Amino acid sequence: LLLMLLFVAEVTSANTVDFDKAFKESARIEKQIKRTSFPKRTFLITDFGAKTDDEANPCHEAINQAILQCSLSGGGTVIVPKGTFYTGPITLKSNVNFHLEEGAVLKFSTDQSLYFPAVLTRWEGIDCYNAHPLIYAYGESNIAITGKGIIDGQGSMETWWPMCGAVKYGWKEGMVAQR
């Protein structure tokens, strides 16, 4: 019994968090964070061809073009106006404030083919090539997502759960499985 109690005590102490060290690390990280700043230029996604309420034609190409042009011009704000915009993956670029006006809704497509080819991303803390996240940036800086609009990933048992690779959630042979 004594041996077992010593073992439990040792295991418990091995799992103890050093809060002082953790807080010092968080303070170091906070010092590296810089406030974003954007030029006054604006880019309206509808000027690049994005249309509302058109589920059959997701407008991610128009949105990504607006973001790219904004970044290439030195930065500014890409505006998603009021309305429902169906979209695929969005890639943010440096010096872009992606702003959703009040009443704006971005509904991401559940068509998994839109999220390929794979991009370098992280899955459970591991760098890997995987499906393009709904909103993505790699190697970019000075980015913000602002506004009172809604970002709707349309996650449901029917749409995203089959990707876990379990038959009980609807996965079938040939489908993408993230496990």
Sequence positions of predicted segments:
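Extracellular "leader-to-stem" segments immediately downstream of a signal peptide or signal-anchor
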Residues: 5-79, 84-97, 101-179
